[in-house]
Amino acid sequence: MFNEWKTQAGLMILMGCVSLTPALAAEKLGKAADNAIYAQTLANEVMASHPELVVIGLHALKPGNTVETMIASNLDRIGKKDDEDDLAVSHERKTILAPNIKDPTKFEVAVPLHDASGKTIGSISAVFKYTAGDDEVKMHKAAIAIRDDIAKKIPDAAALFKPAK
């Protein structure tokens, strides 16, 4: 009897997960090419001037929203909800240095994103080309330099969402 109940309970949980999968898969993410805001202009400039990067992602809370998302990137993931790592970087001012487990040729550095006054307004994730043994501290310094460079161009968080010129 216990085994039947255990199996039924397991199936109910499994069925619940399966039924949620289409809802999660239905999350509609925007294309970088269609993202006509200032933050995307900044992301495009960073990618054009840093050939050592594979990915750049800017994360912030859009005025009027309650959920923080990826607001600009070279990937078609615009609007992707921030995960707990993204939120830890922006809310707790943490820095993340991490090799990509699935692709050992990539190394991610995530740091808080600042505006020109130094206020934290989100996070920036920079994914570098990587070979085992590369200098991770150098990548961290490069990510900080990228962040500091674009911070000078951001008067406040609202500016990120203004139409691109």
Predicted regions and their residues:
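Juxtadomain coupling helices with adjacent low-complexity linkers
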Residues: 27-40, 128-165
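Sec/Tat signal peptide C-region and signal peptidase I cleavage site
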Residues: 20-26
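Extracytoplasmic/periplasmic sensor domains and loops in membrane signaling proteins
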Residues: 73-101, 141-145
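Short N-terminal helix-loop-first-beta-strand/juxtamembrane motif that initiates sensory/input modules
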Residues: 44-65, 145, 156-160
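Bacterial N-terminal signal peptides that target proteins for export
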Residues: 1-13
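Short glycine-/small-residue motifs
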Residues: 122-123
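Flexible loop/coil segments at beta-strand boundaries within sensory signal-transduction domains
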Residues: 115-119
